[in-house]
């Protein structure tokens, strides 16, 4: 009976150790997937911030060029539209329009036009005069924006891909930067865009193998460097 009991205990111990090993592997897989997804979202935010910055600068530039003065160089009522035009850029979700920023069916151009129309409707008697009409300015503003914005957006994309982004990646200022650096630089993990024949599974496997080899320990310790045991900020 005692021998059977010992065998049962040993069997349970073996099963338990196997399940523990499986659980650890699952945890490693979950961690690697989370790290890849986290780096992807960080780079997506970086792309979004740069594209919004480009759109904002371009809209501002075009507004100053086309809305500030009239035909004879006099100040035009439409110059007051710029602030509200930039608010549209700040509020609009970048990826809702950025693949074709000047499309009439996408929200950016629609909402920019709405701003100009609203200002025109409050322009009163001045709208009857061609030299002070805001309605008359809408066409020129839109035409110049259509000519300039797609090129600027493409240039911004190229700059980001070449590592020359106008707006730096904010992750470099965060406590978790060592983990991001580990995935992107040490392991060579790439930002997935769908343009290259590379699956998320390949990226996750790369991180999983590194975790299994214990390579993630130093980056984790780097995140905790200088920690005194007090609660840490989320970032």
UniProtKB/Swiss-Prot annotation:
It catalyses: L-phenylalanine = (E)-cinnamate + NH4(+). The lineage of its organism: Eukaryota, Viridiplantae, Streptophyta, Embryophyta, Tracheophyta. Keywords: Cytoplasm, Lyase, Phenylalanine catabolism, Phenylpropanoid metabolism. Homotetramer. The gene is PAL. Contains an active site 4-methylidene-imidazol-5-one (MIO), which is formed autocatalytically by cyclization and dehydration of residues Ala-Ser-Gly. One of its GO terms (biological process) is cinnamic acid biosynthetic process. Disulfide bonds: none annotated. GO terms for molecular function: phenylalanine ammonia-lyase activity. The keyword Transcription regulation does not apply. It comes from the Eukaryota. Pathway: Phenylpropanoid metabolism; trans-cinnamate biosynthesis; trans-cinnamate from L-phenylalanine: step 1/1. InterPro entries: Aromatic_Lyase (IPR001106), L-Aspartase-like (IPR008948), Phe_NH3-lyase_shielding_dom_sf (IPR023144). It is found in: Cytoplasm. The keyword Ribonucleoprotein does not apply. Its EC number is 4.3.1.24. It comes from Malus domestica. Belongs to the PAL/histidase family. This is a key enzyme of plant metabolism catalyzing the first reaction in the biosynthesis from L-phenylalanine of a wide variety of natural products based on the phenylpropane skeleton. This is Phenylalanine ammonia-lyase. (E)-cinnamate binds at residues 3, 6. One of its GO terms (cellular component) is cytoplasm.
């Amino acid at each position: 009976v005692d021998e059977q009991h010992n065998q049962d205990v040993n069997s349970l111990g073996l099963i338990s150790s196997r399940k523990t090993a499986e659980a650890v592997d699952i945890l490693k897989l979950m961690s690697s997937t989370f790290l890849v997804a986290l780096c992807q979202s960080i780079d997506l935010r970086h792309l979004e911030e740069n594209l919004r910055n480009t759109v904002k600068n371009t809209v501002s530039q075009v507004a100053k060029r086309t809305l500030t003065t009239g035909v004879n160089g006099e100040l035009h009522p439409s110059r007051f539209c710029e602030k509200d035009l930039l608010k549209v850029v700040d509020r609009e979700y970048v990826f809702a329009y950025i693949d074709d920023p000047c499309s009439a069916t996408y929200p950016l151009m629609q909402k920019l036009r709405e701003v100009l129309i609203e200002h025109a409707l409050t322009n009163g008697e001045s709208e009857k005069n061609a030299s002070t009409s805001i309605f008359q300015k809408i066409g020129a503003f839109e035409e110049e924006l259509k000519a300039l914005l797609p090129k600027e957006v493409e240039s911004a994309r190229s700059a980001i891909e070449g590592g020359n982004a106008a707006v730096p990646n904010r992750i470099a200022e965060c406590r978790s930067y060592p983990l991001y650096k580990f995935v992107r630089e040490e392991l060579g993990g790439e930002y997935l865009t769908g343009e290259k024949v590379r699956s998320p599974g390949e990226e996750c496997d790369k991180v999983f193998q590194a975790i299994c080899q214990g390579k993630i320990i130093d980056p984790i310790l780097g995140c905790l460097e200088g920690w005194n045991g007090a609660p840490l900020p989320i970032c």
